[in-house]
A protein has these predicted regions:
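Extended, Lys/Arg-enriched charged tracts that mediate electrostatic binding to polyanionic substrates
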Residues: 137-186
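Double-stranded beta-helix
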Residues: 204-262
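Extracellular structured ligand-interaction cores
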Residues: 18, 193-195, 252-254
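Short, conserved beta-strand element in jelly-roll/cupin
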Residues: 192-204
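Catalytic core of Fe(II)/2-oxoglutarate
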Residues: 242-322
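Short linear interaction motifs
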Residues: 170-191, 236-249
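Compact, glycine/acidic-enriched structural inserts
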Residues: 112-114, 121-125, 136, 142, ...
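Fe(II)/2-oxoglutarate
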Residues: 1-98
Length: 324
Protein backbone atom coordinates (compact mmCIF):
# COMPACT_ATOMS: atom_id res chain seq x y z
CA UNK A 1 0.00 0.00 0.00
CA UNK A 2 1.37 3.37 -1.05
CA UNK A 3 1.44 6.38 1.25
CA UNK A 4 2.17 9.08 -1.29
CA UNK A 5 -1.14 10.97 -1.08
CA UNK A 6 -0.99 13.82 1.43
CA UNK A 7 -3.81 16.29 2.02
CA UNK A 8 -3.60 19.73 3.58
CA UNK A 9 -5.74 20.37 6.65
CA UNK A 10 -7.80 23.49 7.12
CA UNK A 11 -8.30 24.92 10.59
CA UNK A 12 -11.83 23.48 10.71
CA UNK A 13 -10.58 20.02 9.70
CA UNK A 14 -8.17 19.52 12.58
CA UNK A 15 -8.60 16.52 14.84
CA UNK A 16 -8.74 17.17 18.56
CA UNK A 17 -5.46 16.32 20.30
CA UNK A 18 -3.67 17.52 23.41
CA UNK A 19 -0.65 19.67 24.09
CA UNK A 20 1.73 16.98 25.25
CA UNK A 21 5.00 15.83 23.70
CA UNK A 22 6.49 18.66 21.64
CA UNK A 23 9.21 19.06 19.05
CA UNK A 24 11.64 21.66 20.37
CA UNK A 25 14.81 23.41 19.28
CA UNK A 26 16.53 26.62 18.21
CA UNK A 27 15.55 25.99 14.60
CA UNK A 28 12.19 24.33 15.20
CA UNK A 29 10.59 26.91 12.91
CA UNK A 30 12.06 25.13 9.89
CA UNK A 31 9.70 22.22 10.58
CA UNK A 32 6.83 24.54 9.66
CA UNK A 33 8.11 25.23 6.17
CA UNK A 34 9.95 22.20 4.83
CA UNK A 35 7.18 19.59 4.97
CA UNK A 36 8.99 17.66 7.69
CA UNK A 37 5.80 16.92 9.65
CA UNK A 38 2.63 15.07 8.69
CA UNK A 39 -0.33 13.79 10.70
CA UNK A 40 -2.20 10.54 10.23
CA UNK A 41 -5.98 10.27 10.01
CA UNK A 42 -5.94 8.40 13.30
CA UNK A 43 -4.90 4.93 14.46
CA UNK A 44 -5.96 1.65 12.84
CA UNK A 45 -5.50 -2.10 13.38
CA UNK A 46 -2.51 -3.03 11.24
CA UNK A 47 -4.05 -6.09 9.60
CA UNK A 48 -7.04 -4.09 8.36
CA UNK A 49 -4.77 -1.63 6.56
CA UNK A 50 -1.69 -3.63 5.53
CA UNK A 51 -2.70 -7.14 4.51
CA UNK A 52 0.60 -7.72 2.70
CA UNK A 53 2.82 -6.99 5.72
CA UNK A 54 3.44 -9.56 8.51
CA UNK A 55 1.87 -7.68 11.41
CA UNK A 56 0.90 -9.61 14.52
CA UNK A 57 -2.76 -9.77 15.43
CA UNK A 58 -2.70 -7.03 18.07
CA UNK A 59 -0.69 -4.46 16.10
CA UNK A 60 -1.80 -0.88 15.45
CA UNK A 61 -0.46 1.56 12.85
CA UNK A 62 -1.08 5.17 11.79
CA UNK A 63 -4.29 5.37 9.77
CA UNK A 64 -3.97 6.56 6.18
CA UNK A 65 -4.00 9.03 4.55
CA UNK A 66 -1.34 11.36 5.88
CA UNK A 67 -1.99 15.10 5.81
CA UNK A 68 -0.15 18.36 6.39
CA UNK A 69 -0.88 19.82 9.82
CA UNK A 70 -2.80 23.06 10.14
CA UNK A 71 -1.12 26.05 11.74
CA UNK A 72 -2.87 25.59 15.10
CA UNK A 73 -1.72 21.98 15.22
CA UNK A 74 1.84 23.08 14.54
CA UNK A 75 1.50 25.60 17.37
CA UNK A 76 0.70 22.70 19.73
CA UNK A 77 3.47 20.47 18.39
CA UNK A 78 6.38 22.92 18.17
CA UNK A 79 8.14 24.89 20.87
CA UNK A 80 11.37 26.54 21.93
CA UNK A 81 13.89 24.76 24.13
CA UNK A 82 12.66 26.78 27.10
CA UNK A 83 9.20 25.20 26.77
CA UNK A 84 10.51 21.64 27.24
CA UNK A 85 8.83 19.58 29.96
CA UNK A 86 10.30 16.42 31.56
CA UNK A 87 9.76 13.40 29.31
CA UNK A 88 7.64 15.42 26.88
CA UNK A 89 10.13 16.75 24.34
CA UNK A 90 11.65 15.55 21.08
CA UNK A 91 14.47 17.24 19.23
CA UNK A 92 15.82 16.67 15.71
CA UNK A 93 19.51 17.56 15.58
CA UNK A 94 22.26 17.55 12.97
CA UNK A 95 25.15 15.16 13.65
CA UNK A 96 28.71 16.21 12.66
CA UNK A 97 29.88 14.70 9.38
CA UNK A 98 32.95 13.22 11.05
CA UNK A 99 30.70 11.17 13.35
CA UNK A 100 28.42 9.96 10.56
CA UNK A 101 31.43 9.09 8.39
CA UNK A 102 32.61 6.64 11.05
CA UNK A 103 29.89 4.35 9.65
CA UNK A 104 30.76 4.78 5.96
CA UNK A 105 31.06 1.01 5.63
CA UNK A 106 27.46 0.62 6.72
CA UNK A 107 26.22 3.10 4.13
CA UNK A 108 28.11 1.24 1.41
CA UNK A 109 26.68 -2.08 2.59
CA UNK A 110 23.15 -0.63 2.64
CA UNK A 111 23.22 -0.29 -1.17
CA UNK A 112 23.21 -4.06 -1.67
CA UNK A 113 20.00 -5.83 -2.64
CA UNK A 114 20.35 -8.29 0.27
CA UNK A 115 21.31 -7.75 3.91
CA UNK A 116 24.33 -10.09 3.79
CA UNK A 117 26.90 -7.28 3.68
CA UNK A 118 25.12 -5.35 6.42
CA UNK A 119 25.15 -8.38 8.69
CA UNK A 120 28.88 -8.71 8.11
CA UNK A 121 29.41 -5.02 8.79
CA UNK A 122 27.34 -4.75 11.98
CA UNK A 123 29.05 -7.79 13.49
CA UNK A 124 32.57 -6.65 12.59
CA UNK A 125 35.31 -4.68 14.33
CA UNK A 126 34.90 -1.59 12.13
CA UNK A 127 31.33 -1.12 13.33
CA UNK A 128 32.21 -1.85 16.97
CA UNK A 129 34.97 0.76 16.91
CA UNK A 130 32.63 3.31 15.32
CA UNK A 131 30.05 2.64 18.04
CA UNK A 132 32.61 3.26 20.80
CA UNK A 133 33.65 6.57 19.25
CA UNK A 134 30.03 7.62 18.78
CA UNK A 135 29.24 6.79 22.40
CA UNK A 136 31.83 9.39 23.39
CA UNK A 137 30.18 11.94 21.12
CA UNK A 138 26.61 11.35 22.33
CA UNK A 139 27.86 11.22 25.93
CA UNK A 140 28.71 14.90 25.57
CA UNK A 141 25.03 15.58 24.79
CA UNK A 142 23.84 14.39 28.22
CA UNK A 143 23.35 16.29 31.45
CA UNK A 144 26.66 16.49 33.37
CA UNK A 145 24.90 14.97 36.38
CA UNK A 146 23.90 11.87 34.37
CA UNK A 147 26.62 11.27 31.73
CA UNK A 148 26.33 7.52 31.17
CA UNK A 149 25.29 6.00 27.84
CA UNK A 150 23.55 2.63 27.63
CA UNK A 151 22.38 0.17 24.96
CA UNK A 152 24.47 1.60 22.13
CA UNK A 153 24.14 -0.38 18.93
CA UNK A 154 23.72 -0.17 15.16
CA UNK A 155 20.58 -1.57 13.55
CA UNK A 156 19.38 -1.99 10.00
CA UNK A 157 15.85 -2.38 8.65
CA UNK A 158 14.29 -3.20 5.30
CA UNK A 159 13.17 -0.27 3.15
CA UNK A 160 9.47 0.32 2.56
CA UNK A 161 8.15 -0.62 6.01
CA UNK A 162 5.17 1.34 7.43
CA UNK A 163 6.61 0.57 10.89
CA UNK A 164 9.96 -1.04 11.60
CA UNK A 165 10.06 -2.70 15.03
CA UNK A 166 9.85 -6.52 14.97
CA UNK A 167 7.94 -8.59 17.51
CA UNK A 168 8.86 -12.19 16.79
CA UNK A 169 10.67 -12.05 13.45
CA UNK A 170 9.30 -11.66 10.83
CA UNK A 171 6.23 -10.30 12.64
CA UNK A 172 6.01 -6.51 12.97
CA UNK A 173 5.05 -5.07 16.35
CA UNK A 174 3.43 -1.82 15.21
CA UNK A 175 3.10 1.27 17.38
CA UNK A 176 4.51 0.53 20.82
CA UNK A 177 6.22 1.83 23.98
CA UNK A 178 9.84 0.86 24.62
CA UNK A 179 10.40 -1.37 27.65
CA UNK A 180 14.13 -1.14 28.40
CA UNK A 181 13.20 0.35 31.80
CA UNK A 182 9.90 -1.46 32.20
CA UNK A 183 10.11 -1.62 36.00
CA UNK A 184 9.70 2.16 36.23
CA UNK A 185 6.03 3.02 37.05
CA UNK A 186 4.06 4.91 34.44
CA UNK A 187 3.94 8.07 36.55
CA UNK A 188 7.77 8.07 36.72
CA UNK A 189 8.38 7.59 32.98
CA UNK A 190 8.92 11.33 32.46
CA UNK A 191 12.36 10.89 34.02
CA UNK A 192 13.71 7.69 32.47
CA UNK A 193 16.61 7.84 29.96
CA UNK A 194 15.75 9.08 26.49
CA UNK A 195 16.84 7.56 23.20
CA UNK A 196 18.99 9.06 20.49
CA UNK A 197 18.72 7.58 17.00
CA UNK A 198 21.08 8.71 14.23
CA UNK A 199 20.14 8.15 10.59
CA UNK A 200 23.28 6.59 9.12
CA UNK A 201 21.65 5.54 5.86
CA UNK A 202 21.26 7.06 2.42
CA UNK A 203 17.54 7.89 2.58
CA UNK A 204 15.15 9.80 4.79
CA UNK A 205 13.56 7.81 7.60
CA UNK A 206 10.65 8.78 9.82
CA UNK A 207 9.80 8.90 13.50
CA UNK A 208 6.14 8.15 14.25
CA UNK A 209 4.71 9.14 17.62
CA UNK A 210 1.54 9.89 19.55
CA UNK A 211 1.87 13.35 21.09
CA UNK A 212 0.64 12.30 24.53
CA UNK A 213 2.91 11.02 27.29
CA UNK A 214 2.06 7.95 29.35
CA UNK A 215 0.76 9.92 32.31
CA UNK A 216 -1.46 11.98 30.00
CA UNK A 217 -2.80 8.84 28.33
CA UNK A 218 -3.45 7.32 31.75
CA UNK A 219 -5.64 10.30 32.67
CA UNK A 220 -7.46 10.06 29.33
CA UNK A 221 -8.25 6.40 30.03
CA UNK A 222 -9.35 7.15 33.58
CA UNK A 223 -11.66 9.92 32.36
CA UNK A 224 -13.41 7.39 30.12
CA UNK A 225 -13.36 4.72 32.84
CA UNK A 226 -11.31 2.42 30.59
CA UNK A 227 -9.44 -0.25 32.54
CA UNK A 228 -6.20 -2.03 31.67
CA UNK A 229 -3.84 -4.46 33.40
CA UNK A 230 -1.07 -2.98 35.54
CA UNK A 231 0.81 -6.30 35.73
CA UNK A 232 4.41 -5.39 34.91
CA UNK A 233 4.92 -8.12 32.32
CA UNK A 234 2.01 -6.98 30.16
CA UNK A 235 1.45 -3.40 31.30
CA UNK A 236 2.75 -1.47 28.28
CA UNK A 237 0.94 -3.80 25.85
CA UNK A 238 -2.37 -3.54 27.72
CA UNK A 239 -1.86 0.20 28.17
CA UNK A 240 -1.20 1.06 24.54
CA UNK A 241 -3.93 -1.31 23.33
CA UNK A 242 -6.47 0.31 25.64
CA UNK A 243 -5.57 3.71 24.24
CA UNK A 244 -5.36 2.85 20.55
CA UNK A 245 -8.57 0.79 20.64
CA UNK A 246 -10.56 3.63 22.17
CA UNK A 247 -8.92 6.76 20.75
CA UNK A 248 -8.75 5.69 17.10
CA UNK A 249 -9.22 9.27 15.87
CA UNK A 250 -6.10 10.50 17.68
CA UNK A 251 -3.53 11.55 15.03
CA UNK A 252 -0.04 10.08 14.87
CA UNK A 253 2.77 12.52 14.09
CA UNK A 254 5.31 11.64 11.38
CA UNK A 255 8.63 13.52 11.47
CA UNK A 256 11.21 13.30 8.69
CA UNK A 257 14.76 12.40 9.82
CA UNK A 258 17.21 13.04 7.01
CA UNK A 259 20.58 11.29 6.54
CA UNK A 260 23.01 12.70 9.09
CA UNK A 261 20.21 13.82 11.41
CA UNK A 262 19.15 12.28 14.69
CA UNK A 263 16.15 12.45 16.95
CA UNK A 264 16.27 12.53 20.73
CA UNK A 265 12.97 11.26 22.14
CA UNK A 266 11.38 9.80 25.30
CA UNK A 267 10.65 6.42 23.72
CA UNK A 268 9.93 4.83 27.12
CA UNK A 269 7.21 7.44 27.64
CA UNK A 270 5.37 7.57 24.33
CA UNK A 271 3.65 5.37 21.76
CA UNK A 272 5.87 5.40 18.68
CA UNK A 273 7.78 3.54 15.96
CA UNK A 274 9.97 4.22 12.95
CA UNK A 275 9.08 4.05 9.27
CA UNK A 276 11.14 3.39 6.14
CA UNK A 277 8.42 4.06 3.56
CA UNK A 278 9.95 5.61 0.45
CA UNK A 279 13.46 4.30 1.04
CA UNK A 280 15.34 2.65 -1.81
CA UNK A 281 18.16 1.21 0.32
CA UNK A 282 18.40 -0.51 3.69
CA UNK A 283 17.79 1.75 6.67
CA UNK A 284 20.79 2.02 9.04
CA UNK A 285 20.73 3.72 12.42
CA UNK A 286 22.82 4.16 15.56
CA UNK A 287 20.77 4.05 18.75
CA UNK A 288 21.59 4.58 22.43
CA UNK A 289 19.91 5.59 25.70
CA UNK A 290 20.93 8.34 28.09
CA UNK A 291 19.78 11.37 30.06
CA UNK A 292 20.12 13.71 27.09
CA UNK A 293 19.65 17.45 27.44
CA UNK A 294 18.06 19.73 24.85
CA UNK A 295 20.69 21.06 22.46
CA UNK A 296 20.58 24.85 22.32
CA UNK A 297 23.02 27.67 21.58
CA UNK A 298 20.70 30.59 22.26
CA UNK A 299 20.26 30.54 26.05
CA UNK A 300 22.64 31.87 28.68
CA UNK A 301 24.05 30.05 31.71
CA UNK A 302 21.23 31.14 34.02
CA UNK A 303 18.56 29.92 31.61
CA UNK A 304 20.45 26.65 31.15
CA UNK A 305 20.56 26.15 34.92
CA UNK A 306 16.81 26.78 35.14
CA UNK A 307 16.17 24.28 32.35
CA UNK A 308 18.33 21.70 34.11
CA UNK A 309 16.41 22.14 37.35
CA UNK A 310 13.11 21.74 35.51
CA UNK A 311 14.00 18.70 33.42
CA UNK A 312 16.20 16.75 35.82
CA UNK A 313 14.51 15.07 38.75
CA UNK A 314 16.88 16.59 41.31
CA UNK A 315 18.90 13.72 42.80
CA UNK A 316 16.35 11.06 41.86
CA UNK A 317 17.00 10.84 38.15
CA UNK A 318 16.41 7.27 37.05
CA UNK A 319 19.79 5.53 36.65
CA UNK A 320 20.70 3.44 33.67
CA UNK A 321 19.92 -0.15 34.52
CA UNK A 322 19.86 -3.53 32.86
CA UNK A 323 16.54 -4.93 31.76
CA UNK A 324 15.38 -7.73 34.05
Amino acid sequence: MQETNVVVAKESDTVTSISGIRLIGDDVGRLRSDNAIELSSGIAPAKSQYSSFPYWTGAFVPKLPWRRPASDELDSLLGSVETAQPGRWIQVIRIPKEVVDLFAGGRIASKNSTDHKLREYTSGSECREAILKTVKYVGALTWPEQPNIDRASVFFKDPGLPTTTPRNYPELLGLHIDSAYHNVPFEERNHVPMRISINLGLNDRFLLFVSASMDQIHHMLVDRKIQYSMQSSVATHEFRTAFMSNFHDFPVVKVRIRPGEAYVAPTENMIHDGSTVGQTHFDVQFSACGHFRPQCSSIDAAAAAFLSAKLLKDQRAVPLQAKK
